[in-house]
Amino acid sequence: MRDIVLGHVPRDRAIRVLDIGCGTGSLLFRLADRLPSAVLVGIDISPANIQAANQHRAARASTARLQFEAADYLEYRAEPFDAIVTDGVLHLMPGETTALVRKLAGDLRDGGVLVCTMPFDCAYNTMFAVVRRALRAVRFPWLDRRILQIARLVHRGDMDDDSLRERVDYMYIPPERMMGEQLAGCFASAGLQRAAEYPMNSTSPSQLKHGVTIFVRGAVSS
């Protein structure tokens, strides 16, 4: 993800970058080493994630360009950014899609880029969305334990147990939206033109098939 972002933002001038759903800040810390003039802002709805990000930030030699804030993006207000990055978040955000897309466009400067990872609108993902809705309707502790057992087998040696426990919740969350022609048209109507796409490898059969899409803010279509 870092290299994709670096391939679509200028490195030789001061830019503002926002990471929506930044978690503990790992992507921004890696970008900071390659974007020496950038101001890097991370927001996450989890105060625990932001606390961890700020702890990592305090341990770094140079932290002036890194900012972290616990915030819901739909209520977040700031000066426009040159780039917005969101990895596996937009498809989970509740609410009306058009309003979300318009906010993304409004938070970008002219010529700014949006780098987003989302599941594709395809039959495989649609099937898993149905499964997740069904699981959510019958969720109980035994099912959580069974999902965790399966995850341990699938990710044996790849992920620690705490990380696997955190991911159990995602098996009950169907996507609110998926990237396809209809959603791309919604982005275009808000002035965000699709510029590039990069497929991503799934880490398990239960993961939605997804990719990275790059949008550039231009003129709003009539």
Predicted regions and their residues:
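Short alpha-helix
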Residues: I173-A190
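Class I SAM-dependent methyltransferase "Motif I" SAM/SAH-binding loop
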Residues: G21-G25
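Class I SAM-dependent methyltransferase SAM/SAH-binding core
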Residues: S26-L74
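A short glycine-rich, Lys/Arg-flanked "PGG" loop and its adjoining helix->strand segment in the class I
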Residues: T98-D110
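Conserved class I S-adenosyl-L-methionine
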Residues: V115-R146
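A short SAM/SAH-binding and catalytic strip from SAM-dependent methyltransferases
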Residues: A83-E96
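A short acidic, Gly/Pro-enriched loop at the edge of an enzyme's catalytic core
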Residues: Y76-I84
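Conserved alpha-helix/loop element of class I SAM-dependent methyltransferases that forms part
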Residues: M1-R13
